[in-house]
Amino acid sequence: MEEQYDNKDNIVLEAEVGAGDIIYLTVSGKITNERFYAFVAWTEKVKKLVREMSEKHPGNVLLLSEVSGVSHFESKPIVPLRELLNYNKQYPAKSAVVGARDLTRVLLDTVISLTSRVNIKQFKTKEEALVWLLEKPTIEAESLLAPVEAA
């Protein structure tokens, strides 16, 4: 597991490919302006994993983010978070977020809205998130996603 741990601010930033080729992300602790560059490095690692999984599984990149340990999130790291969500729009990816509380949930909702991402959902449990990530699109949803042929 690739892990960046900073004891000073008690932050943990993890990114790894796990079972089912799901990209598992963990963000925990105080995400402060002082730790901005550590957060940027982590988002770059996530982008690399998304690219790799997109090459391995075109059209089916899955991410599961555990954020229940986030106790503080300052303004400066919001920029690379927004850039990460924008970057991932170019890939057919589903992202599930688990454990967001109060202000973290509001922050995520805002960033999701600002980036116009429709394939990110927040869940209370990892089990609920995995069920959603692994569900196949319905026939109706598949037809909505199919290219329209010229008449």
Predicted regions and their residues:
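Amphipathic, Lys/Arg-enriched alpha-helical "gate/interface" segment within cytosolic domains
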Residues: 1-151
